[in-house]
Amino acid sequence: MFALPVLALALAGCEREPESRGESASTERTRPNILLIVADDLGYSDIGPFGGEIATPTLDQLAKEGLQLTNFHVLPSCSPTRSVLLSGMDNHRAGLGTMGELKTPEMEGHPGYAGYLNFEVAALPEVLRAGGYHTYMTGKWHLGHSEETIPHARGFEETFILVPGGGSHWSDLKPVSPTQTMMYRRNGKVVEALPEDFYSTRYYTDTMLQFIERNHEDGKPFFAYLSYTAPHDPLHAPREYIDKYKGKYNEGWDVLRAVRLQRLKDLGIIGKDVEPFPRLASVKAWDDMSDDERLNAARDMEVYAAMVDYMDEQIKRVFDYLKEIGEYDNTMIIFISDNGANGALPTAYPGQTDEYLRSFDNSLDNRGLPNSYVETGPGWAQASMSPSRMFKAFTAEGGIKAPFLVKPPGRLADGGTMNHSLFHVRDIMPTILDLAGINHSEEFNGRKVRPMQGRSVLGLFEGKVKLPYKEASQVGYELFGLKAFFDGDWKILWMPPPFGPGDWELFNLKQDPGEVADLSAQHPEKLKEMVGLWEQYKADNGVLDISLDLSDKVK
């Protein structure tokens, strides 16, 4: 199935022109386009196909046309997931054993902890471009900020990107903390100022449409990486979209979580008897909050919903354009979130100060508008991740379980179906290359590169098989010293107090996706077996014994 080799040093740049433009067009048009859409900190149950009440008609329709994977897993935070997504290998091999902002002296000298997408991997856009694809990116990068590590240097030919992990969604260029820099780049060059009417989600979409339009008549297929920063904090949305959800969340996070839990059961995504992980002790019951606390919290969730709603509308613009130019049916479309919903507070960001946070106008009427800085917090994050334990940053299910929708080129005979098999982000790149007919070589651009650990599941995406390859059911995790390992329906989890017991726990996720009942005492041999598998994972991937104290990041 792999037809085109990735050319080594002489042809790695893929600048060679075809002998005949007409011949190229007729040949290349048979090759599918790839549209990869990533939402930022979107919760598992936020969108309609996964039980959400937020208006997402575009994604609802995508689920009806394609395949919905209900057991898809990513990494606990942004850049580690993106490193796996664009490399097909474990984050420790790809350079994001930790986030760049959280790198410690002990990690220096270890390529797996470089803090950027390292050069031991051939990145997905590099491989696709060498194989004859246009490669476009708009939105969040977060995989390196130097001239050598930005996307324009890693295979993308046209880019408009946010370099760091987050910041204001408006034109004011305000970072998430005063020690960080809000930077955009266009085709590698720093953008000094944004248009006054800039709003991130719209601008990323506008720019991506310009990129696709510019070359669509040349006959070459394209890879478009649309990497939205919605709904990452600070939460910002146009007022009319916020107003659309006014009063929607006045009953609070406990009610919302229960409603979404029931919808997940009704949709057949989880079993009828599933119990959710309890509300965190640090999260107030809604009825115990003051009137002002409830008003502010409800407004914050209204803004969050508005961001997701607006993103869905912008995705529709892309789909409509692809239909207009006759490319929709020839495009594989993948939609994911990069991690679980964010339950951390703004104080979690490195370099944060009270003085900086006080500089914003977070009055009720201005929340979500320019010069505000609000977040959902752990209460709403638990609702967004119903029925899971914890949220972003944790190796519990709430940090690593994400929505996944895919529409292969053409039409699925049984579109609108669900698949409950364990599927991991490491398998996306191999699947895309399989679809494109491109080999992954052991040498790229004059350097030796590691082979991908993930494998193609194209047959699953195309509805030809019901299960991915056998080894797909075994996946290891480590980030910030938090650990996990999957073996089919079984999972072991290690988290320190106060988030866990500081020892391994064992869960059967098919019966208990909320990770409520630790079965380690009942199944000691299974626990021992899986701890051994995790130790092998650690050795194979160069995992260091370094932990990060998260106790002051989540209250």
Provide a role label for each language-model segment.
Residues 21-67, 130, 141, 340, ...:
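Active-site-proximal N-terminal segment of extracellular/periplasmic enzymes that hydrolyze or transfer
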Residues 147-155, 236-237, 320-411:
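Histidine-centered active-site microenvironments of extracellular/periplasmic hydrolases
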Residues 30-33, 85, 145-169, 201-280, ...:
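Active-site regions of oxyanion-processing enzymes, predominantly non-cytosolic
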Residues 149, 157-167, 370-398, 411-421, ...:
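C-terminal cap/loop subdomain of S1 sulfatases and analogous C-terminal strand-loop tails that border
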Residues 48-54, 68-92, 97-102, 137-149, ...:
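Short, solvent-exposed turn/loop segments enriched in Gly/Ser/Thr/Pro and often Arg
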Residues 15-32, 39, 43-44, 68, ...:
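Long, internal low-complexity/basic segments
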Residues 11-13:
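C-terminal motif of bacterial Sec signal peptides marking the signal peptidase cleavage site
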